[in-house]
Design a protein with these regions (language model features):
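Nucleotide-binding motor/catalytic cores of P-loop/tubulin-like NTPases across gene-expression machines
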Residues: 723, 740-744
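A general secondary-structure junction signal
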Residues: 103-105, 154, 234-236, 481-483, ...
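Short beta-strand elements
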Residues: 564, 720-735, 776-784
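Inter-lobe coupling/hinge segments of SF2-like helicase ATPases
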Residues: 250-256, 260-263, 272-706, 718, ...
């Protein structure tokens, strides 16, 4: 098989200048009266020198239509003139929508008199040019409508038309008169005197909310102001860090030789695109390398963007960074209010926040002076959006770092096979940390045979005894089971009936808190039956174990020890996860029962035993990535053990202890298994040695989805043949779960060792679907570089 064709200097095979070949213009159908439309190439559109007052604005609007819409400018011209990146409010059918100007020109496909005018220009200055470039690149690469891409990439309040400007707060300080030893007018106002004394102790001032939190009132503040003893000044919520001020709040930690070597390699090229993979065992001090790289970047007056996989990691990362740095550090994630998110976005765009930390969507945060991008746990599947705009934040971080010409650092104890292939080929620099910061080596996976063994809550007696010994020694235990609920399903032992979802090809999960049956695919809920719906028997029993059942079993076995369950159900309330982790970090003996939420980067220094209830789920799955992902999860959860003063131990229960992949992982480690998986992928012609795109079709009508799938495959194969493209078209075939949410799902796979050809075929397929009337009655999406086949 020929090797893939990444362009020179790229990471995953795409350059910031990469432009897929688009198919010929297609009949787009009738144009809505009042504005013209042009095919949206998502960044491929040229923007000729604009006239001082353009007659036509090409505007991207949040819609599924892959085109720009032409409008006439409104009468009021923005202060800087009309230019790409300005947000505008426009009439669209019977609605008013917020769009973004992409083109300024003099011509349109419709007579200018037929074009609707823009209602309002919402910005005095355009949104950042680099942000607009990133959105256009994203739309082009992922074959997604530019208008919707822009919509998804900006905070909710900007989508609604809110101005992009810094919110301010009052900061109170004593006046020169208030600094006198015995200021007048306070003899009969003791609370005002106390307030003034508190302000004197804070020469840089105090915010209003901080003052009110100390039981003072706004009336007392106004009284001091009226007496000329205190005054307030307005400042941005995120105050800028001034060059020359101390950068660090606490000194950096000393580095071991491996950390120092990695940091020196990163310092070599701080002014250039420099992709590096930092492969470090769990607990090896990758975060300290991040911190010292950021210190160098911010010290040069630039900004750093740090991406973490899940919201659960953001509080601890944020706390660690704020503890180290005196500069503003802002966070962006889904747990923020709309105002908080806009404040952080604006602080980053203005440059007042030198450090930005966030989850997947934070990749779209504009930076005034970009200096470095860091992706922690780069292998994590959470970086891939699984609906709508199906982008991968890690891959876009590569493109963004290349565009800015800045260092990119991807860190992981279990790197993705895509990243490993790039590092081992020499496209990226490969940095390694093989030693833990503690004196103990990472714990080896000990396989425990489940065959023929009696279980309680999924645990066999020898494992329960090891848990008891660990707790008696005063340590903590993490029990990992990647299935929430009480049991995977409910079954009748008289007739074999199973609780199945009416809307999905899946079994319903039994929950005890509250008691119900729930489908984890469509969220359908059902009350627990008193008797079997099939035969009327009352012999209904749970099958298997979930987090709730294991929690219940452990609470009964160890009543004197707290049991903390951490899964999506138990952490729905804001800060619930962080409160549990705070309690666990106190060090008292306890049991943690959780899903993969616990496996991702959390520092649990008092955990010395990790138990994996069942390691078999990914061994024989239909998805070719399942083995890689299962191995990553096992190694990550194992890495929670023995991170401090005591060595760790990891027990992995399995029914397949003789599986060659599992044995290689336990005996030789992740790197050895990754080598084997890469060879298997190469032989099979799978990523990272080939590129994929997946067309997903779904409809409540099975015949509709099957008919369109067949037509699409036939049209695509004909189109590929006419252009002699080296692209394979596989399918259509039913999805692994054919019926989900009462809709039938069908898939068509495109595969090629030439990314440019894959994109050309994908663009042709999208054009055919948009021009085909039957496709309007079926929901469809094209997933570039799919991470799951479900």
């Amino acid at each position: 098989m020929p090797p893939p064709d990444p362009l020179p200097g790229t990471a995953y095979g795409f350059l910031s200048t990469y432009k897929p070949v688009l198919p010929p213009r297609t009949p787009w159908g009738p144009v809505e009266a009042g504005h013209s439309s042009r095919a949206d190439a998502g960044g491929q559109l040229s923007n000729p020198p604009r006239p001082s007052t353009p007659r036509v604005l090409g505007i991207a609007i949040p819609s599924p239509l892959r085109r720009l819409f032409d409008y006439r400018p409104c009468r009021e011209t923005p202060p800087g003139g009309w230019q790409p990146g300005l947000r505008v409010r426009v009439p669209f059918g019977r609605r008013q929508l917020v769009g973004v100007v992409i083109e300024c020109r003099d011509d349109s496909e419709l007579p200018l008199t037929d074009l609707k005018p823009v209602d309002t220009c919402l910005d005095g200055t355009p949104l950042p040019a680099d942000w607009l470039w990133l959105c256009r690149f994203t739309a082009r690469y992922y074959q997604h409508p530019l208008g919707d891409t822009l919509h998804q990439a900006m905070p909710v309040l900007l989508r609604q038309g809110r101005p992009l400007e810094a919110r301010t707060r009052e900061r109170w300080q004593p006046t020169p008169a208030g600094l006198e030893t015995d200021p007048p007018g306070l003899a009969r106002a003791p609370r005002q005197a106390e307030l003034l004394e508190m302000l004197r102790q804070h020469p840089h001032g105090l915010g209003t909310q901080a003052i009110l939190a100390q039981s003072f009132t706004r009336e007392q503040l106004r009284a001091l102001a009226d007496k000329g003893l205190a005054g307030a000044r307005e400042e941005p919520l995120t105050a800028p860090w001034k060059a020359g001020e101390p950068l660090l709040a606490e000194p950096a930690l000393p580095l071991n030789s491996e950390q120092a070597t990695a940091l020196a390699a990163l310092h070599e090229r701080l002014d250039d695109y420099h992709p590096c993979l930092l492969e470090g065992v769990t607990g090896s001090g990758k975060t300290e390398v991040y911190l010292q790289l950021i210190e160098a970047v911010v010290g040069r007056g630039r900004q750093a963007l740090v991406l973490v996989p899940e919201i659960g990691l953001t509080p601890q990362t944020l706390a660690r960074f704020r503890q180290r740095f005196r500069v503003p550090v802002v966070a962006l994630h889904s747990g923020l209010t709309d105002n908080e998110r806009l404040d952080a976005w604006e602080a980053a765009a203005s440059g007042r926040a030198p450090i930005v930390i966030g989850t997947r969507s934070a990749l779209f945060t504009p930076l005034a002076r970009p200096g470095a991008i860091i992706v922690d746990e780069e292998h994590d599947g959470s970086f891939k959006q699984q609906d709508g705009l199906r982008y991968h934040a890690r891959d876009l971080a590569v493109a963004r770092a290349h565009h800015h010409g800045i260092p990119l650092l991807l860190g992981s104890a279990t790197p993705s096979l895509e990243s490993l292939a790039r590092a081992r080929s020499g496209d990226w620099r490969h940095l390694s940390l093989t030693r833990r910061a503690s004196r103990h080596a990472p714990a080896r996976l000990e396989l425990v045979d489940l065959r023929g063994r009696r279980r309680q809550g999924g645990l066999i007696p020898p494992v329960i005894e090891t848990i008891r010994e660990t707790l008696t020694a005063g340590h903590q235990v993490l029990v990992f089971i990647n299935r929430r609920g009480f049991a995977p399903t409910l079954a009748c032992h008289a007739c074999g009936w199973l609780a199945e979802c009416d809307h999905c090809d899946a079994r319903m999960t039994l929950h005890r808190q509250p008691p119900l049956l729930a489908c984890h695919h469509c969220d359908r809920r059902r009350a627990l039956p008193d008797v079997c719906p099939g035969c009327g028997s009352g012999d209904l029993r749970p099958l298997g174990s979930g987090t709730e059942r294991t929690e219940e079993t452990l609470a009964a076995l160890f009543p004197e020890v707290p049991v903390h369950r951490i899964d999506r159900d138990s952490t729905r309330r804001r800060d619930a996860f962080e409160r549990v982790l705070t309690e666990v970090r106190r060090g008292e003996p306890c049991l943690l029962v959780g899903t993969q939420m616990l496996a991702k980067g959390h520092h649990l220094p008092h955990v010395t035993l990790v138990v994996v209830v069942n390691a078999d789920a990914g061994l024989y799955a239909s998805d070719f990535r399942a083995l890689e992902q299962s191995a990553q999860l096992l190694v990550q959860v194992a890495g929670r053990a023995g991170r401090a003063d005591h060595p760790g131990r990891v027990l992995v229960q399995t029914l397949h202890g003789d599986d060659p992949h599992l044995r290689r992982l336990s005996e030789q480690g992740y790197a050895a298994l990754a080598d084997q998986l890469l060879e298997e992928r190469r032989a099979a012609g799978l990523p990272p040695f080939r590129f994929l795109a997946l067309l997903r079709l779904e409809s409540p009508r099975e015949e509709a989805v099957n008919a369109l799938g067949g037509q699409a495959a036939e049209a695509l194969r004909r189109w590929i043949g006419e252009r002699s493209l080296a692209v394979d078209c596989l399918g259509p075939v039913p999805a692994p779960m054919e019926r989900r949410q009462n809709r039938y799902h069908l898939q068509l796979m495109l595969a090629s060792s030439r990314r440019s050809m894959l994109h050309e075929a994908g663009a042709g397929l999208v054009a055919w679907l948009e021009a085909t009337p039957e496709a309007r009655r079926v929901r469809w999406s094209l997933d570039i570089d799919p991470q799951t086949l479900s």
